[in-house]
Amino acid sequence: MNRTAKISRKTKETDITLELNLDGTGIAEIETGIGFLDHMVQSFAKHGFFDLTIKVKGDLYVDSHHTVEDTGIVLGQAIKQALDEKIGIRRYGSFLLPMDETLVLCAIDLSGRPYLNYQAQLTCEKLGYMDTELVKEFFYAISYSAGMNLHIKQMDGNNNHHIVEAMFKAFAKALDEASGIDPRIQGVLSTKGTVE
């Protein structure tokens, strides 16, 4: 089974190419033009064992909003494409990730029904050159373009870098679990017989 995706998306605001292998080893080549976002997405790929290449040319002369949001949209599209008909996947995944004083919970249902429940208390406006309010926008974009029910909750912590990094790593671990193949599952894991 080849669980890969290649996506290209060009607008007046961003030009993005992305390649994803869900069954990789964590090799990442990320170039968004935003150093902090690159670091977070590299952590996502590494801890989820996803091979991921992202090249983004965005209107950073305006601000980082379009680049962050559109990167999330394309990553969500790639996840959806790589999962194809979701045959044999576990569908659900969750992870409670500690990082020093920080504890973050992430839970996923690859149901085809998009929803984001994001609960975090970030106390600074920026991390590097990235506005912290865009962390939520990134995960919102992924959840809606992937058709994913996504819950991310900060349980503890006060260091903003640790909180956001723990979110990305917890998301990676939960997605690795949810997208994993279970040989006991015949078809899709739904009494309806379909998962969109």
UniProtKB/Swiss-Prot annotation:
Record's GO cellular component terms: cytoplasm
GO biological process terms held by the UniProt record: L-histidine biosynthetic process
GO molecular function: imidazoleglycerol-phosphate dehydratase activity
EC id: 4.2.1.19
Reactions catalysed, as given in the entry: D-erythro-1-(imidazol-4-yl)glycerol 3-phosphate = 3-(imidazol-4-yl)-2-oxopropyl phosphate + H2O
Main location: cytoplasm
Keywords, comma-separated and alphabetical: Amino-acid biosynthesis, Cytoplasm, Histidine biosynthesis, Lyase
Localization annotation: Cytoplasm
Pathway the protein acts in: Amino-acid biosynthesis; L-histidine biosynthesis; L-histidine from 5-phospho-alpha-D-ribose 1-diphosphate: step 6/9
PANTHER family, A to Z: IMIDAZOLEGLYCEROL-PHOSPHATE DEHYDRATASE, IMIDAZOLEGLYCEROL-PHOSPHATE DEHYDRATASE HIS7
Family to which this protein belongs: Belongs to the imidazoleglycerol-phosphate dehydratase family.
Name used for this protein in its record: Imidazoleglycerol-phosphate dehydratase
Species, as recorded: Lachnoclostridium phytofermentans (strain ATCC 700394 / DSM 18823 / ISDg) (Clostridium phytofermentans)
The encoding gene: hisB
